[in-house]
């Protein structure tokens, strides 16, 4: 598949090969990661990458766009069908740019926005001080109830009434419970705010009908196209309002982007077609079953799951019961070829670079074909490693590392990813 890269640039070929090996023979539990199909990968590697196409289908600033127009129309139409909306912009290069485009469509610098605090499960683009959203806007963060660890809707309403935001953002990157979009819309309407839902993490679950569709309540919905959607890395913006759609289009181009990535848009179209199948719906159901099983098995073995469980593809694990930090856990598990990410938890006492938790997700494991019984095996592996972490640097006895690596490789070999499908 990469013969030309191998001939032209052996160093990059080696990087690709090593990364393929890492994915093929390691357990991927980062909640925001997944494995794209070969059809999606092929579309991304096509000659469509050569075409500049500033503007939108039928209104381009360059000639020769007749075929990329077809690709973009297919992507838009499939996105609209998938999420039951009237309008879709599939040009954002990323979820962050989708959020930026959505914000800029309905607000001005200095306006007040509300978003979930990063330490409570939100995202950088929901108002973090280090992000454009925290630098451009006056940000009022909301969080979870300290006892239940679920969104405190009373607090959201009180803050909205007090600060009168222009935008209320719902969604997050480490929140495992179903969000009440109806309640959010009621609060937004009460204060005259736009409700923007960032469904990047759970878009695949929405597409499969096992998570409420935010488009029924939000003025604007943003998303990535990877994660649970299992497509290429990119973003999109959805709405049912024609005037908002016009503003969104202007906001993306010429507002914050120039030429769209047509090879990625074609891959988005492929991804949406895959997501419209019954097989995809079954896949998403299994993702949630696996997440619930993994959370229960970890809890059974002494770890604490934030909010007591999960309704989605991800969970936030509090490591305090084992007196291990998120940083140490990420390093230790990584040595054993189990990939996770450290994550702050509600009421965090450590810095984000150390953290008290890890975030786990099941989309990538489920793509391999793993089910509940494998989640039990994986929970056992995770806890066994964590119980043997010796220090803040994630050091673990070599005997434990070698034993776990072997078990991980055996498990991955039982559920091959691209092995036999890609010619190396």
From Swiss-Prot:
Pathway: One-carbon metabolism; tetrahydrofolate interconversion; Amino-acid biosynthesis; glycine biosynthesis; glycine from L-serine: step 1/1. Gene3D superfamilies: Aspartate Aminotransferase, domain 1 (3.90.1150.10), Type I PLP-dependent aspartate aminotransferase-like (Major domain) (3.40.640.10). GO terms for molecular function: glycine hydroxymethyltransferase activity; pyridoxal phosphate binding. GO terms for biological process: glycine biosynthetic process from serine; tetrahydrofolate interconversion. The keyword Amino-acid biosynthesis applies. (6S)-5,6,7,8-tetrahydrofolate binds at residues 118, 122-124, 243, 351-353. Homodimer. Belongs to the SHMT family. This is Serine hydroxymethyltransferase. The lineage of its organism: Bacteria, Thermotogati, Thermotogota, Thermotogae, Thermotogales.
């Amino acid at each position: 598949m990469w013969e030309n890269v191998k001939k032209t640039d052996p160093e990059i070929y080696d990087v690709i090969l090593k990364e393929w090996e890492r994915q093929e023979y390691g357990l991927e539990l980062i909640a925001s990661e997944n494995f794209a199909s070969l059809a999606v990968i092929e579309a991304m590697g096509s000659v469509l990458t050569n075409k500049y196409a500033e503007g939108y289908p039928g209104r381009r600033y360059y000639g020769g766009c007749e075929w990329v127009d077809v690709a973009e129309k297919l992507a838009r139409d499939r996105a609209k069908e998938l999420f039951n909306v009237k309008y879709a912009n599939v040009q954002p290069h990323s979820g962050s740019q989708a959020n930026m485009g959505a914000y800029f469509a309905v607000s001005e610098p200095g306006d007040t926005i509300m978003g979930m605090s990063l330490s409570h499960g939100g995202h950088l683009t929901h108002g973090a001080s280090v992000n454009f959203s925290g630098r451009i806007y006056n940000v009022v963060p909301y969080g979870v109830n300290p006892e239940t660890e679920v969104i405190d809707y009373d607090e959201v309403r009180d803050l909205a009434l007090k600060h009168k935001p222009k935008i209320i953002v719902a969604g997050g990157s480490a929140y495992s419970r179903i969000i009440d979009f109806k309640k959010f819309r009621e609060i937004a309407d009460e204060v005259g705010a736009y409700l923007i839902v960032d469904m990047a993490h759970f878009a695949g679950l929405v597409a499969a009908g096992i998570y409420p569709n935010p488009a029924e309540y939000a003025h604007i919905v943003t998303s990535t196209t990877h994660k649970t959607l299992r497509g290429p890395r990119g973003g999109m913006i959805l709405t049912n309002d024609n005037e908002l759609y016009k503003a969104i289009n202007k906001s993306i181009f010429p507002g914050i982007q120039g030429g769209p990535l047509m090879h990625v848009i074609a891959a988005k179209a492929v991804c949406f077609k895959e997501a419209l199948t019954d097989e995809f719906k079954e896949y998403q159901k299994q993702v949630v079953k696996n997440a619930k099983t993994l959370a229960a098995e970890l809890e059974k073995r002494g770890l604490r799951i934030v909010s007591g469980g999960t309704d989605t593809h991800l969970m936030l694990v509090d490591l305090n019961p084992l007196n291990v930090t998120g940083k140490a856990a990420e390093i230790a598990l990584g040595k054993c070829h189990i990939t996770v990410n450290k994550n702050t938890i509600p009421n965090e006492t450590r810095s984000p670079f150390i953290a008290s938790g890890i975030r786990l997700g099941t989309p990538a494991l489920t793509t391999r074909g793993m089910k509940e019984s494998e989640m039990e095996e994986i929970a056992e592996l995770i806890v066994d490693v964590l119980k043997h972490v010796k220090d803040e640097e994630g050091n673990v006895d070599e005997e434990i590392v070698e034993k776990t690596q072997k078990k991980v490789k055996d498990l991955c070999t039982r559920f091959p990813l691209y092995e036999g499908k890609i010619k190396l």
